[in-house]
Amino acid sequence: MSEGKNKKMNVKQISERLNKENVKKGFEYIRRNGVSRFWTLAKAKAFPAGKSYKEWYEEHCPTKEELMRQREVEFSVQPLISIVVPTYQTPIPFLKDMIDSVRKQSYEKWELCIADGSLNGDENDTKVIRVREELNRYSMEDKRIKVVYLEENQGIAENTNQALALATGEYIGLFDHDDMLTPDALYEIVKAINDYDYDVLYTDEDKISEDSHDYKKPVFKPDYSPELLCANNYITHFFVAKKSIVDRLGGFRKEYDGSQDYDFIFRCVELAKKVGHVSKVLYHWRMHGGSVAGDPTSKMYAYDAGKKAIQSHYERVGIQAYVEHMERLGLYHTEYKMIKQPLISVIIYGEDDEKKKRCSEWFKRKDYSNLEILASAGINVEEINALAEKARGSYLFFVSENLESVERDALQQMAGVLQIQNVGAVSGKVIGRKHTVEDVGVVFRTNGDL
């Protein structure tokens, strides 16, 4: 059987298993055993014993035949994609890999816009000379490659703006000077644009070793989540946006150097009507000395700029909040400021009076004082709904009698989230006695049920 048929069979098997019943089983497994064990099991299923991510990835790469077929596809919408890259004394092997990965694209309507800021006062610097020789050679070989040589290094944001000035496409893609695209990256982007008319979109990614031979640490991202984006720049690479939106932003801002892309992404999604996610690994993020991908602490200023980007986003959209670093760099915690302290009705449900009394005492000792506490006589839904009708509070907090402890500022945090426009409900994470996740929120089903 051919490799292509094997791939199709694998996709079919996965799609057959991804049904309502198995999703339900998955949530039940998490409830009983915790996320850590579930993730271990999921990895074992996805990457069988003895199979590394690299092997899995190479098995799922498009074949030469598939790439050939992609080149023959005629989309009804065929946008020119302008890929912008600021280069700075890029190691020649990385530079070649980066440019070659664009030239190998199965979707060929692109332009590569490079602003080189390698010059740092010495025109005879060997690094500068070699980079510019390579850029000259590539731009002579392929007219889709545009290069501007800057008189000095202006910083990553301003250098990127110089690359943006070269762009004439309908969409702009952000690309780092030492990373690589998969050969089907632009094809998948354009396919998604044709299918869904996205204003901005992003893809999954992984890390690539310094010698370009090993793939690791894949990041399979969720669909667009504004709240998650405010906790972590999970979008990162590969990010593509309509030029009409980019033009309205006024480019990158140098005061966010290090996280200028984070700030840029926030401002793009604020203007976008449709944000899309292409759930395929289409971008390889290079790991090497000095790269954030290799050592997070090597660029602490980047994380400080990220914190500033989130804070600025909140100010633009009218959310009163304070952002702080979490222990793991690159993750941020938001403290929402309470504009007022509305009455919260805590509705405790259960059948054990002693447990309900103990649960009630927990809430009386918390930071939030404007409370009323109501307790049901059992777990009957009608009775709980009747208490909700009776409640005087602006917010209703439903909690089981089995709750044994609550973070001191839990109500303050959750009420703060409810102040955000378009947020109608919020839920916290519930940890069981065995340190397993009992609950981590609710979702709406397509039929409207929770």
At which residue positions do the language-model features occur?
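Short, acidic, metal-binding catalytic loop of nucleotide-sugar glycosyltransferases
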Residues: D100-K109, E361-N370
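Conserved donor NDP-sugar-binding/catalytic core segment of glycosyltransferases
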Residues: D184-Y215, L403-N447
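N-proximal low-complexity "stem/linker" segments adjacent to membrane-targeting elements
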Residues: W39-S101, I319-W362
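Catalytic donor-sugar/metal-binding loop of nucleotide-sugar-dependent glycosyltransferases
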Residues: Y256, F266-H284, Q311-V323
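Glycine-rich, basic loop-to-helix element that forms the pyrophosphate-binding segment
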Residues: L150-A167, G378-A391
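Short aromatic/hydrophobic "clamp" motif used to bind/position activated sugar donors
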Residues: I172, L396
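A recurrent flexible, glycine/aromatic-enriched loop bordering the glycosyltransferase active site
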Residues: A157, A165, Y215-V240, S244, ...
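A conserved acidic beta->alpha catalytic loop
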Residues: D116-R132, E152, E351-K356, A377-V381, ...
